Amino acid sequence: MDQIIVRGNGPLKGEIPITGAKNACLALMPATLLTDQPLTLTNAPRLSDIRTMTALLQSLGAEVASLQDGQVLALSSHDLTSHRADYDIVRKMRASILVLGPMLARDGHAVVSLPGGCAIGARPVDLHLRALEAMGADLDLREGYVHAKAPSGGLRGAVIDFPLVSVGATENALMAATLARGTTVINNAAREPEIVDLAECLRRMGAQIEGEGTSTITVEGVQALGGATHPVVTDRIELGTYMLAPAICGGEVECLGGRIDLVAAFCEKLDEAGIEVVETGRGLKVSRKNGRVRAVDVVTEPFPGFPTDLQAQMMALLCTAEGTSVLEEKIFENRFMHAPELARMGARIEVHGGHATVHGVEKLRGAPVMATDLRASVSLILAGLAAEGETIVSRVYHLDRGYEKVVRKLRGVGADIERIKEVADG
């Protein structure tokens, strides 16, 4: 298993290119199942989750070609050979459930494995299923699979009232609604930029959609969708992560392709902490000149609030802030697993349920730490950039799911970082 070694060595300076959003791309790829015409995605990220979605689509008979070193994906679902998404692939990635709505809408039937780790009665996937049932789908859950059939004549437009905001369920309902008969209204829809990006792509394919980016989306179903070429939106989580690198270490870094509207709530917190963010026309320039950052309080919320996927990285910054910060996690449970690892580096953090209190210290010290998930892994790397001495991060395979060339990008702005093969004991 690989490890990443980070040595704190002062301010960073330079440029970091930001790639297309993984979470957007994972929703855009299944949109190929809505049409028999080619769909081309540009600015695609090169990540393990993208390869998993590629394998899933190919198992259904879709063609997926990776061009220009993986930055362009050419997809075609002209002749599907299967409508069954097997557990062996679906268990690797929850986004696999996004093939359900498109297959059901276009061909009237689908069999999709439930994602791994779903506890009965509290499954996030229930919101996806409720939306499709509202559109007339007949769903039968047996042996770990959803067996779905559309009514004769296809899915029907419906009013869908989500009791909770769900990005994935909004995406599934949105794609299914494009080919449903009549009008579909999605209430309490997710407002994330990835939803807006999906709607823009579907509109390029011929869909009639209004209201994306608000909590109510209206879709007028059409008979068929065509092909399109669509650029994947910038990854706002990767953007925020790399913006934190100079915030933690000092220096000045320009994140190419960055946009304020994607990270507005995050930028407000950086401003409170004393970090300067400037739009340049090519991206966002982030700088921290002198002294410690100020403590700030953070509450994670659905977009346009502070994103839960930047909470761990923000905690790394606040570990050395002047004063005490409180982070409240309102999206996911058990999202503070990085806190004990940061404590190994000298951070003073108290966790009580969904709250973490961070008492800023002057300096972190390098230590061996273990990544527990994708965002935790990068938060430990960021902390290591500003720590005294050497930090060794184990279990970094999580990184490959969400960050492309993280070592190369950080090294390009002056970080002392390398990835090595872990040496086994004995």
UniProtKB/Swiss-Prot annotation:
Residues noted as binding UDP-N-acetyl-alpha-D-glucosamine in the record, renumbered to the chain: R94, R123, P124, V125, D126, L127, D309, I331
CDD domains: UdpNAET
A cellular component term, taken from the record's GO annotations: cytoplasm
Record-listed E.C. numbers: 2.5.1.7
Highest taxon in the source lineage: Bacteria
Keywords: Cell cycle, Cell division, Cell shape, Cell wall biogenesis/degradation, Cytoplasm, Peptidoglycan synthesis, Pyruvate, Transferase
Pathway annotation from the record: Cell wall biogenesis; peptidoglycan biosynthesis
InterPro entries: Enolpyruvate_Tfrase_dom, Enolpyruvate_Tfrase_sf, MurA_subfamily, RNA3'P_cycl/enolpyr_Trfase_a/b, UDP_GlcNAc_COvinyl_MurA
Location within or outside the cell: Cytoplasm
Residues carrying 2-(S-cysteinyl)pyruvic acid O-phosphothioketal: C118
HAMAP family membership: MurA (MF_00111)
Function: Cell wall formation. Adds enolpyruvyl to UDP-N-acetylglucosamine.
Protein name: UDP-N-acetylglucosamine 1-carboxyvinyltransferase
Species name: Paracoccus denitrificans (strain Pd 1222)
Taxonomic placement: Bacteria, Pseudomonadati, Pseudomonadota, Alphaproteobacteria, Rhodobacterales
Gene, per the UniProt record: murA
